[in-house]
């Protein structure tokens, strides 16, 4: 039987919705035996926003739901959910007992999406469904490596042994009896708590099972482990599939990548605003104000106004003295760690425009480093493990959100005739641009809804995977290296794909209403 692996990248609601579109189209494609291509997906790896889509799909399978019901259910959640808004409001409530926003998010996820379901619910049913392997991925900070919440069937290896994926990682392995108590809401939160937006989730302290007296001995034996967004080390979810391939054959690996693909150059705009104000001049202004209040005391008659002026004078004196003393203490401490002499009084004459530039340029460059340079480098390294490995030749597809955006190059492996068929229309490029403009958030803004980003993202997931499967089939016609009889199942879809691609070119959103597919 043909075995397909799919990884669902991170990217907040942008990713979750794009992946929903991808899965819905795989469900639309009917193979020669009448089964949807989605039923041949046996391995799922997810990151951050992609974990919502993947977990919901897996959980629905375990509950015996049809593909149609699973996908339409997630469609409703993504379009109507206000989890972040509700969590923020309730977290700021003075009566709220949760010590962190991410814990409040877990509570809301549990109430509104996963309804108290646990990994144990999936473990009990994994042998009865079409999914053999599932891995929702987070990052643990102690060893700067992946932390996998895995559920899988016991697989016989090529060497004759038996293997099942590790829950956790090589440094921290979670016993199955503990793992089955972990809530799906906690898995999603751990995989998607991105730095800057949320606090780290500490294992096992922040997990619900830690409160059960039965687990006290285990909880006390584990040193708290900080866990955050899986996209920090692998935003495409590639590594778990590489590891699974060592245990079993994979005929096709679809990397569903919801990165927005922006390539804006790094810039920092300098401004002349506040260029006439420095700390020294601010001190002079403060001194003038203090002198002014002191002078008023000589002319204001005794009574209410005397008290008011006296209070204002005292407040300004306290502020002035506090700033002077704290600055002196800070400079003295800092000077001890600097190996050269420096006239620190010169700093007082630097205007605030320069200070803004000094601080702003460093802050924006750090953000650019982590959010762009670092993430792009990690992405390249992860893709290299697939595209530089001959064992993956003709067994991989990158399904990227930004591929068909305006100005992107595409189809370099196609013949001129194939390029004519595959060329995206203006309507397709416009839709892709709208979809790719969605930020990495866990909510829709009013503007997002007005512009139609939810529908644009679903459509982008659908026509991108249609386009990429068709390109894959065209390439296989010229080179069948490393393929088997199992790949004929995919090649037989060519006619369906060509017909749908022509419809997408006319109306990119003709399948965007999930309930009508």
Residue ranges of predicted features:
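Catalytic domains of lipid- and phosphate-ester/thioester hydrolases
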Residues: 1-517
């Amino acid at each position: 039987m043909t075995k397909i692996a799919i990884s669902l990248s991170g990217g907040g609601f942008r990713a979750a919705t794009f992946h929903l579109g991808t899965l819905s189209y795989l469900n639309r494609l009917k193979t020669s035996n009448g089964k949807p291509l989605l039923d041949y997906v046996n391995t799922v790896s997810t990151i951050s926003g992609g974990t919502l889509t993947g977990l919901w799909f897996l959980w629905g399978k375990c509950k015996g739901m049809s593909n149609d019901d699973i996908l339409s259910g997630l469609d409703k959640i993504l379009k109507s959910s206000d989890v972040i808004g509700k969590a923020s409001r309730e977290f700021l409530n003075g009566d709220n007992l949760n010590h962190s926003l991410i814990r409040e998010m877990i509570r809301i996820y549990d109430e509104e999406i996963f309804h108290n379901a646990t990994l144990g619910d999936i473990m009990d049913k994994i042998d009865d469904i079409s999914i053999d392997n599932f891995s929702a991925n987070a990052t643990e900070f102690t060893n700067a490596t992946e932390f996998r919440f895995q559920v899988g069937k016991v697989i016989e290896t090529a060497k004759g042994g038996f293997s099942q994926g590790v829950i956790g990682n090589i440094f921290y392995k979670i016993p199955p009896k503990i793992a089955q108590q972990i809530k799906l809401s906690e898995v999603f939160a751990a995989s998607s708590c991105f730095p800057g937006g949320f606090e780290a989730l500490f294992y096992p302290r922040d997990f619900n099972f830690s409160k059960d007296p039965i687990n006290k001995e285990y909880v006390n034996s584990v040193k708290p482990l900080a866990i955050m967004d899986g996209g920090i080390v692998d935003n495409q979810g590639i590594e778990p599939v590489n590891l699974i391939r060592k245990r079993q054959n994979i005929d096709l690996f679809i990397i569903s990548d919801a990165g927005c693909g922006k390539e804006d150059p790094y810039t920092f705009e300098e401004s002349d605003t506040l260029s006439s104000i420095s700390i020294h001049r601010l001190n002079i202004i403060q001194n003038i104000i203090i002198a002014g209040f002191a002078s008023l005391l000589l002319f204001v008659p005794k009574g209410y106004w005397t008290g008011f002026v006296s209070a204002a004078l005292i407040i300004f004196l306290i502020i002035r003295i506090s700033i002077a003393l704290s600055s002196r203490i800070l400079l003295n401490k800092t000077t001890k760690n600097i190996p050269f002499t420096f006239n620190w009084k010169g700093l007082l004459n630097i205007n605030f425009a320069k200070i803004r530039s000094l601080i702003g340029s460093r802050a924006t460059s750090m953000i650019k480093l982590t959010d762009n340079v670092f993430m792009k480098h990690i992405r390249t390294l992860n893709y290299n493990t697939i595209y530089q490995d001959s064992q993956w030749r003709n067994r991989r597809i990158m399904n990227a959100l930004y591929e068909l955006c305006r100005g992107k190059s595409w189809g370099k492996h196609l013949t001129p005739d194939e390029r004519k068929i595959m060329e995206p229309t203006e309507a397709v490029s416009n839709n892709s641009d709208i979809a790719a403009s969605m930020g990495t958030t866990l909510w829709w803004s009013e503007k997002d809804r007005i512009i139609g980003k939810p529908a644009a993202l679903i459509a982008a997931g659908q026509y991108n995977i249609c386009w990429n499967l068709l390109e894959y089939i065209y390439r296989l016609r010229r080179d069948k290296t490393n393929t088997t009889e199992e790949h004929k199942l995919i090649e037989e879809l060519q006619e369906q794909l060509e017909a749908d691609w022509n419809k997408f070119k006319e109306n990119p959103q003709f399948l965007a209403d999930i309930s009508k597919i």
